[in-house]
Amino acid sequence: MALPGGAAMNITIRLQFEKDIVSFSDIAAAIGKAGGDIVGIDVISSSKVHTVRDITVSALDTKQCDLIIEALKKIRGVKIVNVSDRTFLMHIGGKIETNSKIPVKTRDDLSRVYTPGVARVCTAIAEDPRKAYSLTIKRNTVAVVSDGTAVLGLGDIGPYAAMPVMEGKAMLFKEFAGVDAFPICLDTKDTEEIIQIVKAIAPAFGGINLEDISAPRCFEIEKRLKEELDIPVFHDDQHGTAVVLLAGLLNALKIVDKKLEDIKVVLTGIGAAGIACTKILLAAGVRNIIGVDRHGAIHRDETYENPYWQEYAQLTNPDNLKGSLSDVIAGADVFIGVSAPGILKVEDVKKMARDPIVFAMANPIPEIDPELAEPYVRVMATGRSDYPNQINNVLCFPGIFRGALDCRAREINEEMKLAAAKAIASVVTEDELNETYIIPSVFNSKVVERVRQAVVEAAYRTGVARKDNIPVGGYTGQ
């Protein structure tokens, strides 16, 4: 999840102003002078003396909103009736609800959907648990599980504050892929307790999406759940980012005419997303990846307390380079940032190989300002929606879960992730591909179905799909 910005800072100001004292042009001028942009005007009421209007204003941030309101307060004859943040209005009462698929209008309806008729369905599932997939919501339902410890851009804000993010995630599952998802925010940071809770609720779900759980706990939680459950478990902060990154890189390399096996990649931020990005790149065929964290390049001559870094050192940096980001980036074809704002300098970009590719994905502020980097890079991507080539997990998780659910996959394996990345990349045609369009829009209607199909094929190919014809049971007339 990215921090709010842009259109998310729209506010609606209800103003009452006296016609004989002030004109609307005075109001518009004050808003513009304070830095606001009027995007909508609605007349609520009008009389000989007063006019009441709702003015929707776009602002950069909350400070600018305050400046706009203060400017309006200073205008004689203007009264501020109310100020509404449109983003907050969308969240009142939560963003999702449960709907019934079958109307219950008669006693007969009631007896079939609940007692006594439901007992026959329960018995059928007890006799053959596979029928849970055909007779309950399990086959199309995903749990979005978080403890609120690593909400991107906000950090450890806890389970209550994480709920709006998880509700939003559930909405996107439904809107983009028709998957019913439910947010589950846990009031515990204990790794073992989280594992046991998720295992206990798993019978109701066809998949588990782990979200915004801090590293290194997220690695152990996902690993254990994948081992102990027979449904897909997917930590989106790791693998969703990795899949979309690879999709973008595949297309970027076409533009610069380079191959995965020949490139040098420097990656900053060896946390959950950084490690997952590295692993998918290695699986795709990249041979030379150098991971850099705050202490410099990860190399084999160092003993790290973090066991994941120790493993990382064995898998990467074939030349065992040492030093800072600035030291190791010389000659790099690709920079990938999942770290912190402003750590990549223009001087670093100048040291890179010809036609450098930069994925600066820190949110809300990338590792380098795209406008500063633009003269020196061939392809630039960020995690932001206000620049071209946004690396957005929404391109991945709806389609990858849609495919996994449709074939009843036991897991989402590396081959399925690779297939998803290639499918996303394929949505951008050869005619469309250019430096500012290496990745499709999240609203491209082809994405989910293309990913779904590729994931299903990979699941069958690797033997993790279990879709078969399960008899529903009950009287069939035969």
From Swiss-Prot:
Q: Which is one GO molecular function term here?
A: malate dehydrogenase (decarboxylating) (NAD+) activity
Catalytic site residues?
Y114, K169
Please state what the protein is called. Answer: NAD-dependent malic enzyme
Q: Please report the stretch or stretches of sequence annotated as the ACT domain.
A: 12-86
Task: Name the Enzyme Commission number(s) assigned to this protein.
Answer: 1.1.1.38
Describe how its activity is regulated. The activity is enhanced 5-7 times by ammonium and potassium.
**SUPFAM superfamilies attached to this UniProt entry:** Aminoacid dehydrogenase-like, N-terminal domain, NAD(P)-binding Rossmann-fold domains
